[in-house]
Regions:
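Conserved beta-strand positions in repeat-built beta-propeller and related beta-rich domains
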Residues: 3-7, 60-64, 114-118, 171-175, ...
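A short loop-to-beta-strand structural motif that recurs across blades of beta-propeller domains
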Residues: 9-13, 20, 66-69, 120-124, ...
């Protein structure tokens, strides 16, 4: 299991069978704008927020550097993949595109999807040979809100998490206290769960409450939500939209 250890500016590898944690990338120092990468354990990185594994490559949402980075696990190299490092909403080639604190990341086929939180948008990155970035939905750095719709008409507010299930992308619309769903083909976004008011109420999708939901994970039956300010894991049924809170058993 790989972990984005945000405030330590590291990516960690947890070997569950051996109960062992090792560093996969980063030297413990916060990277600065213009970092070019290099040997994984010698390269400073900055606030890795989320990651996704593709064979022996990790794609990392490097929030602190406004870029997407790659970690080659076999060659033990870490380097920028997409984003100029300048905070912006700018589509185009992976070298020219601009991100603003990319946070959530997921992979479907040969496309990365990114919750670009400070820009309040969702991006798609076509992997090689295309190597380009485009915006699917949302506003810009100062164009945020809570509005369903299509493409640039959509308004999100600091989305931090994203997860894919079939032809749907689920979005943790963090500051709107909602879960949204996006169809990448049509670029349509609509509310999926959450009333929009911060709270912890379980129940039907439109009445349930979240409080700054962050990370997402999805199975064939349910969406699991790291409900950050409620210090809880919530479960949303993909068929009914019903929301409940997971009771976690503890052992010593």
């Amino acid at each position: 299991m790989y972990i984005a250890d945000t405030e330590n500016h590291l990516v960690r590898a947890a070997h569950l069978g051996m109960r062992l944690v090792a560093t996969a990338a980063g030297n413990g120092h916060q990277g600065l704008w213009g970092e070019h990468g290099g040997a994984s354990l010698e390269t400073p990185i900055s606030s890795p927020w989320d990651l996704v594994v593709a064979n022996r490559i990790l794609f990392v949402a490097m929030a602190g550097l406004h870029q997407i980075w790659m970690i080659d696990l076999d060659r033990q190299l870490t380097f920028p993949y997409a984003g100029s490092g300048r905070e912006a909403r700018l589509d185009g080639s992976v070298d020219e595109a601009g991100f603003a604190q990319p946070s959530g990341i997921t992979l479907v086929g040969s496309t990365l999807y990114v919750a670009d939180s400070e820009s309040n948008i969702i991006r798609a990155i076509a992997l090689p040979p295309a190597n380009d970035v485009r915006t699917l939905a949302g506003g810009d750095l100062f164009e945020f809100g809570d509005r369903d719709g299509r493409g640039d008409d959509v308004r999100l507010q600091h989305p931090l998490g994203i997860a894919a299930s079939g032809d749907r992308l689920f979005i943790a619309d963090t500051y709107n206290h909602r879960i949204k769903v996006l169809d990448p083909a049509s670029r349509k976004v609509k509310a999926f769960a959450g009333s929009g008011k911060p709270g912890s109420e379980d129940g039907a999708a439109g009445k349930a409450q979240f409080y700054e939901p962050g990370g997402l994970s999805v199975t064939s039956q349910a969406l699991y939500v790291a409900d950050t300010n409620n210090h809880a894991i919530r479960r949303v049924s993909l068929t009914t939209g019903q929301v409940d809170t997971i009771t976690l058993a503890t052992t010593v």
